[in-house]
């Protein structure tokens, strides 16, 4: 296969564009803005989980408050009924003693329930303070998350612009190449490595491996427009004297 100096130079430019596109793709998956966003997102999710746990705990305490208040109300009504019976004078001595005993028990029960209710209300107040603090932290994290998302979007937009620019240049450059030469280059790239590299002294510019003397002599003896390949990696070797990358 033959490739004139102009074609070789275009191929070298194509290899440089592909290398830059590879670097752009790597940057897109290793953006510091992405890591920052993921960190804030993790903190935001953790705060959401804490808020959910606090809400569940608050609902449980609210249920306890309702139960205690209901029990206290029932005890109070029972006590009011017993006191009405005591003051009615329509009971005998034994009934009076039983009523008084029940009233004493109800008073102790009411006092115990009210103490328990007070303890739950105190816990509920502490929980409300935690919810308030967590809500403020969550609001701050929402703002941080929005800022991190914007920074990531801007970085991705910049990368997309660079990718589009280099891809457009690549398309235009590929159109100028001999189809057979372009096909060889693409097949080499499909193997996972660079499709072409400049011969730099004794070293292949694609794989950076030094070429043996015997093989280098064969490469040097080939015609200037003869397409030669690296004996190590198979990349097209571009022999371009005086051409700066």
Swiss-Prot record:
PANTHER family: PHOSPHOLIPASE C-BETA-2-RELATED (PTHR39082), SCAVENGER RECEPTOR CLASS A MEMBER 3 (PTHR39082:SF1). The keyword GTP-binding does not apply. InterPro entries: CT398_CC_hairpin, Oxidative_Scav/Glycosyltrans, Zf-RING_7. It comes from the Bacteria. This is Uncharacterized protein Rv2229c. GO terms for cellular component: peptidoglycan-based cell wall; plasma membrane. Keywords: Coiled coil. Residues 33-176 form a coiled coil.
């Amino acid at each position: 296969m033959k490739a004139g100096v102009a074609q070789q130079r275009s191929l070298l430019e194509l290899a440089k564009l592909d290398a830059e596109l590879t670097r752009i793709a790597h940057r897109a998956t290793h953006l510091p803005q992405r890591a920052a966003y993921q960190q804030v997102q993790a903190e935001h999710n953790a705060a959401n989980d804490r808020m959910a746990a606090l809400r569940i705990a608050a609902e449980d305490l609210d249920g306890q408050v309702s139960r205690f208040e209901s029990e206290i109300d029932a005890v109070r009504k029972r006590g009011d009924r017993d006191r009405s019976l005591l003051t009615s004078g329509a009971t005998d001595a034994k009934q009076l003693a039983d009523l008084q005993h029940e009233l004493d028990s109800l008073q102790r029960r009411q006092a115990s329930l009210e103490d328990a209710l007070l303890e739950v209300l105190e816990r509920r107040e502490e929980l409300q303070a935690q919810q308030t603090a967590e809500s403020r932290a969550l609001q701050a994290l929402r703002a941080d998350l929005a800022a991190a998302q914007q920074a990531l979007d801007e970085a991705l937009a910049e990368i997309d612009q660079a990718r589009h620019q280099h891809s457009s240049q690549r398309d235009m450059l590929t159109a100028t190449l001999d189809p057979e030469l372009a096909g060889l280059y693409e097949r080499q790239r499909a193997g996972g490595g660079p499709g072409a590299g400049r011969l730099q002294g004794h070293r292949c510019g694609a794989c950076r491996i030094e070429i043996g003397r015997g093989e280098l002599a064969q490469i040097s003896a080939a015609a200037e427009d003869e397409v030669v390949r690296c004996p190590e990696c198979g990349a097209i070797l571009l022999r371009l004297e005086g051409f700066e990358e």
